[in-house]
Amino acid sequence: MASLNQDQIKTLEQSRQRLVQLTRSLASLIGSLNQSDPLPSWSSLQSQAGIISNNLLSISEHLSDNKDLLSALVAYPGPSYPGRTQAPTLEQLLRTKLDPRVEDWVSRGRRAGASALEDRGALSESALAELWDWAPVEANQEARRRNWGGNFTLEEREMGIQNVVTGLRRQLEDEDEEESESESEEEGEGEEEEMEVVGVRRRSGAGAGLEFDIAAPTPGSRQQQQQKAAGPAVPLEDILRYMTTGIPPTQR
């Protein structure tokens, strides 16, 4: 192979830098596990694992983009290389086979990837499309059979709430009584009622899609919406940061 040009040398230098970053991240995680007593917090471990994952992803993308160059390169020592004093490093550079442990990891990863590709139990694209077409209507029908937000389900109310064993020592009130009291309190206020979706069904005819039933909310549902709106709102960015790093979001 001819001598390397500046772009190829730059590619090798970028590979070295990425591998050094990964090595330092792994050493930092191992050191924190071996030296910390008690062990580091979950958020700290999650943060270090995220850094290692990003380093691995960066190396994988870099090696894939420069696969042709890296597969054509051949390492050999020059006349000025200190082979006697740097013999271990030279052996690693001239090694043609993977380390036995690394080779075992690679073989297990390849077997897992092959089994995932051969998995015939997964749904096809047409089956997934049919599932997503069926799910909204069926979920809405099931939701309308439930009494969301109450102390008792519809099945428990049908068989009598006095026969329900809740395991609680406090007295649960019937929702009908609460709704009648709230209705009497809201009489004469003259507030404008917002419309809400109470049903969904598949549109008949040649046109595809769903159609929704619109109705005014009941006093009980309005009260539930006010209770939900009173809760603290967490920004989506804080939620995603908590999912990836484990750092609890700050309520605003």
Curated annotation (Swiss-Prot):
This is Mediator of RNA polymerase II transcription subunit 8. Residues 173-196 have a biased composition (Acidic residues). Residues 6-30 form a coiled coil. Belongs to the Mediator complex subunit 8 family. One of its GO terms (biological process) is regulation of transcription by RNA polymerase II. Its main location: nucleus. PANTHER family: MEDIATOR OF RNA POLYMERASE II TRANSCRIPTION SUBUNIT 8. It is found in: Nucleus. It comes from Neosartorya fischeri (strain ATCC 1020 / DSM 3700 / CBS 544.65 / FGSC A1164 / JCM 1740 / NRRL 181 / WB 181) (Aspergillus fischerianus). It holds the Pfam family Med8. The gene is med8. Component of the Mediator complex, a coactivator involved in the regulated transcription of nearly all RNA polymerase II-dependent genes. Mediator functions as a bridge to convey information from gene-specific regulatory proteins to the basal RNA polymerase II transcription machinery. Mediator is recruited to promoters by direct interactions with regulatory proteins and serves as a scaffold for the assembly of a functional preinitiation complex with RNA polymerase II and the general transcription factors.
